[in-house]
């Protein structure tokens, strides 16, 4: 519904019409930058569950003869959100396209975790300006985490007024209404909720592939690490009910999926918001391991919530994979305190020791930030020493990127960028060294590989992943795609393994 229609329907008075620069009418709450103080108040509000999602008949057929294109940036949660939006588009009658030139609607599903991710999005918006000029009927939308930031919305309003639609992470289920308004309105349509949404079940999905599937188990994060924008862009922790998750996993198993990954900004906090029962991630994993699906992973973990019961359940093995991504961020207790991670170096190492005792062959990977405000040489050396002590299989490493509205962004930073880059290089040298050492141990071994498709570099070579998430390239028949096979490793590289398929595909019982 556009402004004129709203006035005619009596929903607003003409005198209430805002000036061109005042878009507050589109926001459910007052439009302000992320606030740590206000965000922490949110835990008092009850989360509501909705199992009756339906697309109104008035919107069905909206997409007949039209095509949509979604470009996804960032984490697995964004990929999952894209699957949901694609499902809604298809239910509206749209067809997918891989080309922006063929699309009638283009959505950029954005990431706000680092400045570099935001720059990529703004670069893409700039590239699409010419396309929009040539095709004025094209609907160009920006959604995802960046849309939850005041500075981003203001920048789009000021510098990219040709964008038609902006919506956030909490109202994806309102995509039909938002598209309808974008078609009718002559102004930019903006709907960003400061308050996080409820848990909406039965949303349609168009999954990418039939081999591996994402299963969202919770939304949001309440940890408020001082450097992180996610608690503001994704809202408070809200867990899906276990029965809904179990039903979804059973359905994927029946459809022939070989692997699922449980998703959440902090999966280890799963269930902590339930008021009617004591039920955590360990309980959920214990139920899921009984389902006839070969592989179950989860990401991402927070060390603070990684409890003994979860370790006990994971140690049962079976379809619960012994690959754990456990972000440490820094090896210095002082830096961890400034980050508000709520654990120190010793506690993290104790957790690692518990995991390795229960699962001696577990593969551990991590995330590390270098160049946090005022990080000293000694504190950085502590990160290097912790990495060597744990011997992670691999790591995602980053230079600290300040995010507007977070406490860390207000800290005075005396670490020059030159020093930050040098530290990142030194850390990556250690990461590569230990990864190469770990991969070398696979030479001569036979490993189970879930074959995902042809290698990106050579169509005559197949590629897949081991139970411990190691990339394997090997020679084998195309019929093996989508199957579990045994591969003998001949050569180890820093980040991948080369081998040859041995025997037939593994029968999954």
Swiss-Prot record:
Cofactor(s) needed for function: [4Fe-4S] cluster
NCBIfam families per the UniProt record, alphabetical: miaB-methiolase, MiaB/RimO family radical SAM methylthiotransferase
Record EC number: 2.8.4.3
CDD domains, A to Z: Radical_SAM (cd01335)
Disordered: annotated segments: 1-21
Organism: Bacillus licheniformis (strain ATCC 14580 / DSM 13 / JCM 2505 / CCUG 7422 / NBRC 12200 / NCIMB 9375 / NCTC 10341 / NRRL NRS-1264 / Gibson 46)
Job of this protein: Catalyzes the methylthiolation of N6-(dimethylallyl)adenosine (i(6)A), leading to the formation of 2-methylthio-N6-(dimethylallyl)adenosine (ms(2)i(6)A) at position 37 in tRNAs that read codons beginning with uridine.
Binding residues for [4Fe-4S] cluster 2: 221, 225, 228
Lineage: Bacteria, Bacillati, Bacillota, Bacilli, Bacillales
Name by which UniProt lists this protein: tRNA-2-methylthio-N(6)-dimethylallyladenosine synthase
Family matches, as InterPro entries: Elp3/MiaA/NifB-like_rSAM, Methylthiotransferase, Methylthiotransferase_CS, Methylthiotransferase_N, Methylthiotransferase_N_sf, MiaB_methiolase, rSAM, rSAM_horseshoe
């Amino acid at each position: 519904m556009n402004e004129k229609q709203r006035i005619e329907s009596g929903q607003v008075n003409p005198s209430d019409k805002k000036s061109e620069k005042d878009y507050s009418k589109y926001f459910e709450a007052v439009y302000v930058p992320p606030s740590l103080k206000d965000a922490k108040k949110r835990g008092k509000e009850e989360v509501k569950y909705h199992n009756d999602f339906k697309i109104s008949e008035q919107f069905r057929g909206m997409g007949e003869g039209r095509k949509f294109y979604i470009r996804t940036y960032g984490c697995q949660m964004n990929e999952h959100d894209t699957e949901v939006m694609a499902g809604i588009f298809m239910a509206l009658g749209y067809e997918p396209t891989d080309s922006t030139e063929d699309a009638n609607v283009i959505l950029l599903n954005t990431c706000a975790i680092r400045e570099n991710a935001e720059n990529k999005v703004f670069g893409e918006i700039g590239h699409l300006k010419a396309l929009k000029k040539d095709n004025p009927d094209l609907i160009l939308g920006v959604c995802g985490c960046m849309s939850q930031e005041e500075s981003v919305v203001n920048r789009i309003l000021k510098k990219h007024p040709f964008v038609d639609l902006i919506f956030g992470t909490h109202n994806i289920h309102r995509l039909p209404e938002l598209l309808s308004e974008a078609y009718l309105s002559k102004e930019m349509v903006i709907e960003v909720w400061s308050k996080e949404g409820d848990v909406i079940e039965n949303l349609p999905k168009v999954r990418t592939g039939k081999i591996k599937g994402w299963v969202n188990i919770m939304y949001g994060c309440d940890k408020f690490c001082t450097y992180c924008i996610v608690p503001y862009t994704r809202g408070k922790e809200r867990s899906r009910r276990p029965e809904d998750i179990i039903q979804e996993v059973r359905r994927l198993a029946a459809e022939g999926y070989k692997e699922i990954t449980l998703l959440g900004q902090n999966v280890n906090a799963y269930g902590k918001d339930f008021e009617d029962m004591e039920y955590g991630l360990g309980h959920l994993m214990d139920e899921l391991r009984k389902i006839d699906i070969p592989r179950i992973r989860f990401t991402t973990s927070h060390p603070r919530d990684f409890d003994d019961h979860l370790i006990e359940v994971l140690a049962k093995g079976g379809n619960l994979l012994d690959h754990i991504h456990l972000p440490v961020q820094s090896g210095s207790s002082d830096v961890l305190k400034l980050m508000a991670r709520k654990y120190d170096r010793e506690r993290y190492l104790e957790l690692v020791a518990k995991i390795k005792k229960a699962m001696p062959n577990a593969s551990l990977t991590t995330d590390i930030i270098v160049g946090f405000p005022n990080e000293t040489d000694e504190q950085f050396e502590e990160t290097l020493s912790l990495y060597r002590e744990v011997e992670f299989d691999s790591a995602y490493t980053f230079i600290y990127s300040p995010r507007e509205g977070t406490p860390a962004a207000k800290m005075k930073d005396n670490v020059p960028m030159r020093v930050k880059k040098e530290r990142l290089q030194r850390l990556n040298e250690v990461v590569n060294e230990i990864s190469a050492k770990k991969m070398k141990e696979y030479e001569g071994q036979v490993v189970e590989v879930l074959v995902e498709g042809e290698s990106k570099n050579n169509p005559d070579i197949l590629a897949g992943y081991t139970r411990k998430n190691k990339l394997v390239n090997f020679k084998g028949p195309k019929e093996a795609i989508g199957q579990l096979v045994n591969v003998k490793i001949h050569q180890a590289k820093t980040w991948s393994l080369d081998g040859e398929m041995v025997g037939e595909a593994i029968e999954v019982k």
